[in-house]
Amino acid sequence: EVEIEKINKIINFGKKINKNEKDFENKKSEKNFFEKTRELLGNDSVLKNSQKNEYVDLYEKYMRKVSKETTIKSAFHLPMKILEKGQYHITTGEIDVESLKVESKKYGTTIGKYLLSVYFKILLDRYSQAKNPIVIGVPVDLRKIFEETTYRNFFINITPSVDASLGAYSLSEIITYLDNYFALKITKKEFYKSIYKAMNPMQNIIIKSVPYLIKRMFFPFIFDYYGERGYTTGFSNLGIFKVNKKYEKYLKGFRFLPPPSKRCKIKMGVISDCNKVYVNFGNLTANYDIERDFFVYLRKRGIKSKIITNYF
């Protein structure tokens, strides 16, 4: 009961902050939020380990004047009609973790990379005539790379891409490509370039002088044009979500819903526990061919999925 009371207090405090989002942009309010969270959680080990760098903006800390990262400016986009505003279709596949482990080991890869490879395979087979490259945005947690602890966001999207015009790709070819791409891109040196590209515009004096409300109005359009224009879709893998054992009996499973995007239209989010992997598709269209093809592909390889949706 004490633990539940603490959680409720945190939720209510978060709602209070949410009412004045602009005020939360102020570092003093942000600091107040995290101090209140620590007070309510007590001696939580994760919070304790994060105390040193909890308010540090690590993007600024690691920004160096290096050459800018080169990315694809215009990716292939799914030719589907968007649903009416307010609709977001979710398809979740609950999969036994052992069956995925067995299959991914056949290719000498991880479960996350195997699922990403299958996603690429489905898109390449379905859109083999795509003129622009098929690009999947994959967020990487930089806190692990730079060995940092912070409450603030610190991630960068990497953008593996495959040119469908080069011909058909086997799953093995895609996995080999991703192994090489990840080995090259997931390094501190490469992320310095990514951080510089992301942060450099924010150092512009003109942009700094623009009032917050105006930024709030135009930033979504800028992000859509300069950011997600270069993605076909997104793939986020949170990995294993660990919960205190005393709470496990109250949980039926997990969901990780990827944020909707008019440009990408369909995204995938993956989260796991010790027994199952939960593959979640977020879809802003009424076309479910990609989701169907994905789970059918796994089923043909002996990987069964329990499918749950919010639209049937």
Where in this protein do the model-derived segments appear?
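Short loop/turn and capping residues at structural boundaries
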Residues: 8, 115, 309-311
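Acyl-thioester-dependent acyl-group transfer interface
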Residues: 12-25, 92, 101, 124-312
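Charged, low-complexity, helix/coiled-coil-prone segments
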Residues: 44-47, 54-66, 113-126, 233-245
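Short amphipathic alpha-helices and their capping loops
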Residues: 10-89, 94, 144
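Acyl activation and transfer enzymes in specialized metabolism, enriched
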Residues: 1-5, 90-128, 279, 288-289
